[in-house]
A protein has these predicted regions:
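Membrane-embedded transmembrane alpha-helical bundles that form the catalytic cores
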Residues: 1-470
Length: 471
């Protein structure tokens, strides 16, 4: 089930909210857990068993990994933590990468091993990382193990963030599982944030995504150098508004139920470097790899050479996490190399040039990165880069490119503005100057308008999944 579907908006969500708020507080986690299972089962009923099994493993290993338990054997917490790592990484490797490894082995060794054709359980990359971080944090003594299985199961299955993040760590919501802010004001903030996210996805991401699909599926004879760049720029906007839209919707839904999830995006396209970009993009994933991979490997504490190696390991794994395909690994290595260069020498040089050129530098390498990310077919990927850099035998620009530019010019201008802090600053100024009008009239009116327009878009379009669902 998609957040951006009429079934979710006008059936599932109202039923959940009504049920949640009419039952006693003590049973609300149970309501969330049951409806989260329904939400997950809507698309993949078979894999509910897998998610529940992961929760049971996390519950048991969490109890055993808690070093603060009395009469605990010396090595039990370590063994429990290792068991959780093996289980979660094993699940990911089996369901997400088995066919990739089989294909790679067949290509390298000339074997003919048949692929298993496994369907990827939706959300497995996210809930595996969440349960893994829970057990590791318990082992490190940063949080106590959860004794109530229902509370832990609610945390793992919580439908607002189950499918595509943000990666919510247990330590950030542990107290909220017992007591949370279920006020009218908090609920209204959630509706506002959800409306913004829905508009980002349905109105902005889907619209510019049509341009990327059109260009990427066009015949070579219809393209130009400018069109190839236009296509990747379209994808650059699409993935941001699609994914940040989902995160906004998840955060908004969380607020409707009293939860406060951490932010996942902070205007990444206003970055002045790639280092800055990765502090702003998918922040929950970046911080996860920092805390559970980079720092345990030694971080920057074991010399410059070891730090460089650690950075490359982290970025290879970041690319690998995104999907079982070579382009994702290349994408991870690409950003790893740039980050290394910025850390070793490029970062200092960037600070000496005007901020405008820092932005241009960052955007150029961000767009090229999405060019790698967007094509899983290596042949199409290489052909597109040939086209982009004038090696594909294409004209610089043609009539078809001019048509696309004319057709999407207004959309692109809106996307550029929406990628900056300008809309937020304007809203803040309005709230300061006219707090009553803004809070009581303008904000609710804008939210309702977004919901109405988004619904109209949904009525005229078919299935439109979020891009990050496949990861």
């Amino acid at each position: 089930m998609l957040f951006s579907s009429t079934t979710f908006l006008f059936a599932f969500l109202p039923i959940v909210l009504i049920t949640y708020y009419i039952v006693p507080r003590i049973t609300r986690n149970l309501v969330l857990f049951i409806f989260s299972l329904v939400f997950y089962a809507w698309g993949e009923p078979v894999y509910i068993v897998l998610m529940i099994a992961s929760t049971i493993v996390a519950y048991i290993t969490g109890l055993l990994a808690d070093k603060q338990r009395k009469n605990e054997k010396k090595y039990t917490p370590l063994i429990a933590m290792i068991g959780a790592v093996v289980w979660n990484i094993g699940l990911l490797l089996f369901f997400k990468y088995t066919d990739f490894f089989i294909g790679a082995a067949n290509s390298i060794f000339g074997t003919q091993i048949k692929a298993l054709g496994l369907a990827l359980p939706i959300g497995i990359s996210f809930y595996s990382f969440q349960t893994l971080s829970y057990v590791i944090d318990v082992y490190k003594g940063e949080v106590r193990s959860q004794k109530n299985f229902l509370d832990l199961a609610t945390y793992v299955a919580l439908f607002p963030q189950l499918i595509a993040g943000p990666i919510v760590r247990y330590i950030d919501v542990a107290e909220q599982l017992k007591k949370r802010n279920e006020s009218i004001e908090h609920f209204a903030q959630g509706v506002w944030r959800f409306s913004i996210g829905l508009g980002k996805k349905v109105i902005l991401a889907n619209t510019i995504g049509e341009l990327f699909d059109t260009i990427s599926n066009s015949a070579q004879s219809e393209l130009s150098v400018a069109a190839s760049w236009l296509g990747i720029i379209a994808y650059t906007f699409q993935i941001y508004f699609d994914f940040s839209g989902y995160s906004d919707m998840a955060i908004g839904l969380g607020k409707m139920f009293g939860f406060d999830f951490l932010e996942n995006f902070n205007y990444p396209y206003i970055s002045t470097s790639i280092t800055d970009f990765w502090r702003r993009w998918h922040m929950s994933l970046s911080s996860w790899f920092r805390d559970y991979v980079y720092i345990p490997l030694g971080g920057n504490r074991k010399g410059k050479a070891r730090q460089c190696l650690n950075i490359m390991i982290v970025w290879f794994l970041t690319g690998f996490w995104h999907g079982a395909n070579w382009n994702f690994m290349l994408w991870g290595v690409y950003f790893g190399v740039i980050l290394l260069c910025e850390k070793l020498f490029l970062g200092k040089a960037l600070k000496k040039i005007p901020a405008f050129f820092q932005h241009i530098y960052a955007l150029l390498f961000i767009v090229i990165g999405w060019g790698i990310f967007s094509y899983e077919d290596f042949g199409k990927l290489t052909q597109n880069f040939k086209n982009m850099f004038g090696a594909g035998g294409l004209p610089l620009i043609n009539h078809q490119t001019v048509f696309w530019l004319t057709q999407y010019a207004v959309t692109i201008v809106i996307l550029v503005i929406a990628s900056t802090q300008l809309p937020k600053k304007l809203c803040l100024k309005l709230q300061i100057k006219c707090p009553e009008i803004c809070g009581c009239i303008l904000q609710p009116l804008f939210a309702l308008t977004l919901l109405a327009v988004s619904t109209a878009y949904l009525a005229g379009n078919s299935f439109n999944p979020f891009l990050y669902f496949r990861f």
